[in-house]
């Protein structure tokens, strides 16, 4: 049976891994998942991410903790298969007054809401991270 929402699966694996105190989580890889993981790494929410190229590529994410607590307090899906959420640059959400990020898929690639706003791009809001 195929997975209907691989991005939700990725976010759930990260959330469950941090709640369980895991060092790293692994999942099937895709270009979009790697792009999301790259943004999370650039913003300091995860330690590292790498793709293990086998017959089925696997994405491995090293989780980050500060003082024994997960760095990611909240991570959840915004746009989903049943209800896509597209926003123009003016309508991109500010998460926790700018302390969190929204990950946006634009025509120029996957980036944070702040980056998309600064280059004047809108797009599909994939998820929120705080």
From Swiss-Prot:
It holds the Pfam family Ribosomal_S8. InterPro entries: Ribosomal_uS8 (IPR000630), Ribosomal_uS8_CS (IPR047863), Ribosomal_uS8_sf (IPR035987). One of its GO terms (cellular component) is ribonucleoprotein complex. Keywords: Ribonucleoprotein, Ribosomal protein, RNA-binding, rRNA-binding. One of its GO terms (molecular function) is rRNA binding. One of the primary rRNA binding proteins, it binds directly to 16S rRNA central domain where it helps coordinate assembly of the platform of the 30S subunit. Belongs to the universal ribosomal protein uS8 family. NCBIfam families: PRK00136.1 (NF001109). This is Small ribosomal subunit protein uS8.
